[in-house]
């Protein structure tokens, strides 16, 4: 493919509105352009990469018996009313009316549609299992689109749905998808973790998220690609290294989620779902009496602990939430933070939000900072973190502004349901007892769910079993964020290319090193002087030879300065660069392997053999 015929609008500078490196590079390198807030056009390079990723998915899904189809993006609201999600999904749902004033939506996901199609076609367990998927644009009216393709209003997604006679059958397909996802993301060249996740608005029970780990900005060996003029990082002057570090730190570490993972085992979970090892501790032998003490101007845990000269872990933090319009008290030890997702999941609540101070005063008779679990009305449900039950003679709010209780003991002074509702901290013991927890930022690229009968129950999708009894179909759901894969790959494969000029000055600039299976082309073939006939003839011969061997070639035939061509080549990020330059008359070309920065001169007749050796290496 001739570069002069492609739409690749590279920019000389990074876009000023980009905060993460993936967004900046995909715009600067000419992969995407924003059409309006949260809506992007995928230009030829991006489209080729996305199509290659689709090919990987199709190959892996065929291995597990998944069948591709296509459902409409424009959906009748009646289906979503039937499932109950039309009212509960929230403001992200695009709602519209046709000329007859009938309600429609633009699909953000397709559980209802697939459930209806199978409900109307499948009547017996003998017709199951079914494993269907589609690759399609989805729509969500994001309040604040940001970070390029990571948070958009229109996005490309692979969503799959499986239908089963029972949970044992679902378990088999769920495991098939887990392995398929691992194969897909490995082939895509991604550093990822499969982690325990939250089902969120999808409903259902078990779920696993797949997160692309966002690299930190401190490992220079990971970020820098050195030109052949620079032997090692140690040869770069200290002042230049400082400039490089400043440039690296200028970009936000991307990823909407925090991953908690073990340093010594396979345990990994979204921070929303992460837990730690818990071992009950021994309580004090004697219990003190509850005593009300004055604590003027003490509202935070630190202020109360300091005023009473006690350890903060001897205090009970009391928080008030409204869950489905009912008050719920959450108790934690000291400065532990509540994990809203754990609390919401335990309550099986559709809506959970922190109460206002006015609501707190109405229920407790006191404002924030003086709340406590003692003497609460029976109508108020108390959920306590499991660590709270180990406390003895603790301090809590007295439900009177400016006062606290000492000598508070769980069970004797209040009754609660004990469950893990705290947010874990880095350095705590992994729940399997192996290693400690470390945190990393991550980009969600895939999610698999065991939906169970959440949608078949509400939409009447039933089958007759072996005994002729009617049972709801058991479902699974499997999603991959196709367009955000491009962001995740660039986030992990962005590099700073460093070179030294003939005069000894150091230069560095951003570019991409695409993994082989996702690169829009395999080889970037650059002609230094397009006006030189020998160079042109050699370029055409090399292009033909490479294509004959199955290489996809982007030939830079533009009449541009060589520096501009090399700069664009680094930005575009193809794995191999072949340069036809000054030695074209001798049949000599330069080969550069982008991932390592290694370069070698070879005769054009030996190019194919050399590439096979270098790429295998």
UniProtKB/Swiss-Prot annotation:
Biological process terms in GO annotation: prolyl-tRNA aminoacylation
EC numbers on record: 6.1.1.15
GO cellular component: cytosol
Catalytic activity: tRNA(Pro) + L-proline + ATP = L-prolyl-tRNA(Pro) + AMP + diphosphate
EC top class named in words: ligase
Top-level division of the source organism's lineage: Bacteria
A Pfam family that the UniProt record links to this protein: tRNA_edit
Gene Ontology MF annotations: aminoacyl-tRNA deacylase activity; ATP binding; catalytic activity, acting on a protein; proline-tRNA ligase activity; transferase activity
Annotated keywords: Aminoacyl-tRNA synthetase, ATP-binding, Cytoplasm, Ligase, Nucleotide-binding, Protein biosynthesis
SUPFAM superfamilies: Class II aaRS ABD-related (SSF52954), Class II aaRS and biotin synthetases (SSF55681), YbaK/ProRS associated domain (SSF55826)
Entry's localization field: Cytoplasm
Matches recorded under InterPro entries: aa-tRNA-synt_IIb (IPR002314), aa-tRNA-synth_II (IPR006195), aa-tRNA-synth_II/BPL/LPL (IPR045864), Anticodon-bd (IPR004154), Anticodon-bd_dom_sf (IPR036621), Pro-tRNA-ligase_IIa (IPR002316), Pro-tRNA-synth_IIa_bac-type (IPR004500), Pro-tRNA-Synthase_IIa_type1 (IPR023717)
Entry-linked NCBIfam families: PRK09194.1 (NF006625), proS_fam_II (TIGR00409)
Complex and partners: Homodimer.
Family that this chain belongs to: Belongs to the class-II aminoacyl-tRNA synthetase family. ProS type 1 subfamily.
Primary role: Catalyzes the attachment of proline to tRNA(Pro) in a two-step reaction: proline is first activated by ATP to form Pro-AMP and then transferred to the acceptor end of tRNA(Pro). As ProRS can inadvertently accommodate and process non-cognate amino acids such as alanine and cysteine, to avoid such errors it has two additional distinct editing activities against alanine. One activity is designated as 'pretransfer' editing and involves the tRNA(Pro)-independent hydrolysis of activated Ala-AMP.
Domain notes per entry: Consists of three domains: the N-terminal catalytic domain, the editing domain and the C-terminal anticodon-binding domain.
Protein name: Proline--tRNA ligase
Gene name of this polypeptide: proS
